[in-house]
From Swiss-Prot:
Tagged with keyword Disulfide bond: yes
Protein name, entry field: Interleukin-36 receptor antagonist protein
GO CC, any one term: extracellular region
Keyword Disulfide bond assigned: yes
GO molecular function: cytokine activity; interleukin-1 receptor antagonist activity; interleukin-1 receptor binding
Pfam families: IL1
Gene that this polypeptide is encoded by: IL36RN
Role this protein plays: Inhibits the activity of interleukin-36 (IL36A,IL36B and IL36G) by binding to receptor IL1RL2 and preventing its association with the coreceptor IL1RAP for signaling. Part of the IL-36 signaling system that is thought to be present in epithelial barriers and to take part in local inflammatory response; similar to the IL-1 system with which it shares the coreceptor. Proposed to play a role in skin inflammation. May be involved in the innate immune response to fungal pathogens, such as Aspergillus fumigatus. May activate an anti-inflammatory signaling pathway by recruiting SIGIRR.
Organism name: Homo sapiens
Disulphide-bonded residues: C8-C154
Length: 155
């Protein structure tokens, strides 16, 4: 089955900070200028070129007009690239730099970079900080990166 459009999800980290777009950056927080933030609609499609059993997904914002990318450098850097999510979905390339393996763990999910195994989407405990990538720490202290997300389909 081929999708005609991306699926819509909202994401919160396990500390209940919502993901939202501000100045072309994906941040995690709850209040902005005293107003509760609803959270960005995250466009999601599967990556049809990678092993489906690993749940490979491509994540986009702004209606899928920009996609999360890990880049192609020595170490991954999370950026938003102006690429249409449906072009990645329908294209004939692996698009690993745009792909994350979604792992469900009960009510939450983690997202591991397909291009950089061992690197995960994360937030930090402080509010209104950029979403980034991290390697899982050996022991998580109070300021450890948060790699678990609630991932719920839009209403």
């Amino acid at each position: 089955m081929v999708l005609s459009g991306a699926l819509c999800f909202r994401m919160k980290d396990s500390a209940l900070k919502v993901l939202y777009l501000h100045n072309n950056q994906l941040l995690a927080g709850g209040l902005h200028a005293g107003k509760v933030i609803k959270g960005e609609e995250i466009s999601v499609v599967p990556n049809r070129w990678l092993d489906a059993s690993l749940s490979p997904v491509i994540l986009g914002v702004q209606g899928g007009s920009q996609c999360l990318s890990c880049g192609v450098g020595q170490e991954p850097t999370l950026t938003l690239e102006p690429v249409n999510i449906m072009e990645l979905y329908l294209g004939a390339k692996e698009s690993k730099s745009f792909t994350f393996y979604r792992r469900d763990m009960g009510l939450t999910s983690s997202f591991e970079s397909a291009a950089y195994p061992g690197w995960f989407l994360c937030t930090v405990p402080e509010a209104d900080q950029p979403v980034r990538l991290t390697q899982l720490p050996e022991n998580g202290g109070w300021n450890a990166p948060i790699t678990d997300f609630y991932f719920q389909q839009c209403d």
